[in-house]
Amino acid sequence: MLRKLQPNAVLNVCGPDVRWCGNEAGHCRKAEWSVVPAELRDAERTASKSQQADDGEFSRKIDSQDEDIGSREVIRNARELVWYPSEVDTSIRTGWFYHPEEDTDVRTADELRDIYLDAVGANASLLLNIPPDTHGRIAAPDCASLAELGAKIRQIFASNVTEKAAIAADSAIAQHPITQAVDGMADTYWQAAYGQESDTITLKFQKPQKVSCVVLGEHLPTGQRIESGEIWADGSKASEFTVVGHKRICRFAPVDVLTLTIKITASRTEPTLRLLEVYQ
């Protein structure tokens, strides 16, 4: 009935579309893979699971609270894989419903900003619970925190300096040059040359630019591929990252840089990027 009445609805936890991240604190994994063993989707609907045979396929039980559910080691013996992205669920308050005595215990904008960056910026979606009060309205402390959160997010992404740089990649296929990673189009993307499972992208500025954030996104119609990478500023490592997926937000201490280098150090096949943005 849900599919019939709300065909675009996303079913979570006990549903087949997105999976619970495994906690209600707003945390997600260091490497949040969207491709996971199909048994995880069944585990979401089943309270208890029994081991069926003593072999590689059944020797490890998978559930949403496991730290590693998508690495090569985990999926190697899976009978079937599914696209099952993570959703981070948490509340702006200590609980899921409104209680007036909690008006002084609302999560701050700084806390919510960190949750946003750690979830949305790590290949997960974010479902933030904001309970209405007994009059059906959002309480004033919640509104104030949310308004400040919006301002903080806008500030982080206010100054995009990507267009100020000349961009190059060590390799690319002819149909998908590196310029397609920075053209702002959702359906164009860069892909490394065939056979490449690592690559380096270089952005060179004509004059020093203060940089503190890099946003990456893969071309998901061709799959989630990137496993790890590094960001270097004028020869010094500024940040490391694991999976990219829909979006990876890499924040680091502000640095004045002439040459910014993004090294994809491991990928399951030729890496792709549909999104590459650099912010002050």
Please give the residue ranges for each predicted region.
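Short proline/glycine-enriched turn/loop motifs at strand-loop junctions of beta-rich domains
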Residues: 208-209, 224-226
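Extended extracellular/luminal ectodomain segments enriched in beta-structured repeat modules
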Residues: 198, 206-213, 257-258
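Long, charged, low-complexity intrinsically disordered regions
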Residues: 237-238, 280
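Edge beta-strands of jelly-roll/beta-sandwich modules across compartments, strongly enriched
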Residues: 268-280
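Mature catalytic domains of secreted/periplasmic carbohydrate-active enzymes
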Residues: 1-197, 203, 215-217, 224, ...
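Short loop segments at secondary-structure junctions
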Residues: 208, 235-236
